[in-house]
């Protein structure tokens, strides 16, 4: 290999390793909202508590790419949706509004998504996302998504799937580990 080819190859490798690359992680959680008594329906107790708790830094998607917590430069929510998956033909119209927050030890609770439009007959609803960098939450010992929900319990028990996708920007070190296979 001549010097010019080596220089060009080295420059291309350096450029590839200095740029961020993104890893997308998607997950789903299913919860059941039980049908309510008349009193519960009037009280507005919807029974939709903690959303999901997770440790993204230990996810297989990151580990398989050779990425460690120190390699993460930015994390943003790309998609969040709720879907009534049971009963057949069910919808989310019993919900008035949902605010989704992220929490982690020693970090403030921050609003990351919200929705206040749950039309009758529509099983799938996508949330409006806030522009929040979740990096500090993701690299903490644990991260929790929590919800503030208003509405009434449904007429019949409803299974709701909550789906989300986060995009994780990885530093040059993580990109190089991925490119060279060094883990």
Model-predicted regions and their roles:
Residues 15-16:
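C-terminal motif of bacterial Sec signal peptides marking the signal peptidase cleavage site
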Residues 82, 153-183:
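Exposed low-complexity, polar/acidic, P/S/T/G-rich flexible segments that act as propeptides
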């Amino acid at each position: 290999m001549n010097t010019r080819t080596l220089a060009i190859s080295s420059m291309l490798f350096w450029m590839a390793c200095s740029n961020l690359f993104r890893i997308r992680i998607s997950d789903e959680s299913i919860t059941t909202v039980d049908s309510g008594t008349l009193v519960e329906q009037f009280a507005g107790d919807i029974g939709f508590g903690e959303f999901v708790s997770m440790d993204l830094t230990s996810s297989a998607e990151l580990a398989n790419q050779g990425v460690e917590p120190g390699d993460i430069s930015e994390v943003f929510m790309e998609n969040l949706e709720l879907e009534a998956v049971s009963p057949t033909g069910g919808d989310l119209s019993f919900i008035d509004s949902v605010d989704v927050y992220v929490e982690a030890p020693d970090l403030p609770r921050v609003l990351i998504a919200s929705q206040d439009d749950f039309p009758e007959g529509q099983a799938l609803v996508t949330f409006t996302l806030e522009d929040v960098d979740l990096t500090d939450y993701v690299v903490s010992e644990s991260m929790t998504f929590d919800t503030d929900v208003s509405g009434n319990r449904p007429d019949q028990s409803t299974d709701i799937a909550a789906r989300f996708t986060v995009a994780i920007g990885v530093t040059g070190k993580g990109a190089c580990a991925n490119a060279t296979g060094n883990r």
